[in-house]
């Protein structure tokens, strides 16, 4: 077992312990005190694990972070603080015996620490404050950091990530079950954008496609079914002695009786149709009427799923809750000699009837509540005179019944055919009957349209309630995104702290390259590829759709990153125009000597972004023009690119050393693009220089047209001899 596998095993065991620790917060403190020895023993184990692993994992995240190590840092710190808080609260409860004060202290009800104001400072001193209070705010901040990734100093970026981890420790706590107030289910994340890239947009904008979508990445929904029906499992766990105590056995029997009353799953006409269809198979001669019956039976089953038949009522849920509570009290009397008063028992009397419906019960699965709410909504709809169609027999059911009647009692007389043209022309036109028929058809159409809209609304609200009421756990996307951003800043910090040679080029070398490139023009056919290179350099480490298994163009990755960071449309237009480029160097050669990636004097974030785009454009187009003029193959790579970086221009985004280039003596840092290009040109010339021994002379022959003549063409028939140099 390697270290990563060992860390995964430790994380799994810590999760198991964290769930038990979280449940203790809601338990009756008297019950916890009755087994205080085990609590102390497990608490010592948690303290030992914290002291053993926490600092090492924290250092690991500052070198090479992963979603697992970031989560482990959050989990260990939260469990450590939770154990100390529980121990202090239990000590106070032993003195005052006040359950209300105990729960206020354990659950932190008198204070809210799940808010954070982060002061972000860019590399030129521009500062602004960001307020964080939910997981969506954290994810949105990470997306915005990804958008201005190049404008943040690596130390500042790592400091911000550290504050986010501290907030996640407070917000998530020791348990992965998400608090309802810690997230907004209707706000999408970057992962939602990534999912939409795999499906066609059908001409719809991204914002329209995201409208009404519920995010299941920051918090993942977990479905729990039939919790209330696990009475058999509870009986096995209680044992024979507890079952024979008081009314335990009788209460368990009453709970079993509640859910024995089930409604019929199918309508009567569907059952009759299926009995008739069983007589036919693929080898039978199937009449047309049987084929029609089969088709209508299929559509009838599909339509019945729209209106859900809820197999449980509100009265049954209330009875179930009351009986389970009585069972809990009886078991508590047997084990501890008194009725337990946990947090839920103390706060139950404070809830209204509507609040109880949405808060639910610990004895009933959330899916039951969702079915109940949906059923009550549809029942209320049925009582409306406008939508009586819900309670009436629909056309599919009527057609199935008529087909069954025709099969059982076939008619001997043929149905009258359609009247011929002459008879139709001779018939008297009944205007009143036609008006009534058209009015009925119009009302039917309006009713169906309204019905479909109402049912679509019910389904949408059902999805929302399902997300809110069901159990949600914290997803791993927030930890993955945070680890990617941290690794980018860590890599930049390594290059910032590294010892590199300083370029020895002067202003004359800068001017030499610039003067050689300025009169030239960039080939027009290179601009599309150069635009993709610029988008690749500007895209933050989080928007890596162009590196995925199904890669997208770099401009799409940049567009999704800008959209989710909520960049204004006019800024996106400025970015697109800047990246388009031009073949004339006088337009984009604007950087002064040793001023590359220098933002001094800029006091606005938007202006800083525009200046950064101009820097990247000048770097990309200058290198491309240099390659075209001098016949080079120099490439620009980011520091987070995989592979060998030697021989390429390395872009670090650091203010002190924005460019690195590997020369013969090692890495050299540059703050000027054209000095770097001169260094590459000089290194190439030095490699091509050959030392000539003393006393050896070479005569250089003047080239002439005879060098191009084939052997069989030297007779002068093709190239006149007068053109040859004698």
Swiss-Prot record:
ATP binds at residues 626-633. GO terms for biological process: viral DNA genome packaging. One of its GO terms (cellular component) is host cell nucleus. Keywords: ATP-binding, Host nucleus, Late protein, Metal-binding, Nucleotide-binding, Viral genome packaging, Viral release from host cell, Zinc, Zinc-finger. GO terms for molecular function: ATP binding; zinc ion binding. Its main location: host cell. InterPro entries: UL28/UL56. It is found in: Host nucleus. A zinc finger (C3H1-type) spans 189-217. It comes from the Viruses. Belongs to the herpesviridae TRM1 protein family. Associates with TRM2 and TRM3 to form the tripartite terminase complex. Interacts with portal protein. Component of the molecular motor that translocates viral genomic DNA in empty capsid during DNA packaging. Forms a tripartite terminase complex together with TRM2 and TRM3 in the host cytoplasm. Once the complex reaches the host nucleus, it interacts with the capsid portal vertex. This portal forms a ring in which genomic DNA is translocated into the capsid. TRM1 carries an endonuclease activity that plays an important role for the cleavage of concatemeric viral DNA into unit length genomes. This is Tripartite terminase subunit 1. It comes from Human herpesvirus 6A (strain Uganda-1102). The lineage of its organism: Viruses, Duplodnaviria, Heunggongvirae, Peploviricota, Herviviricetes.
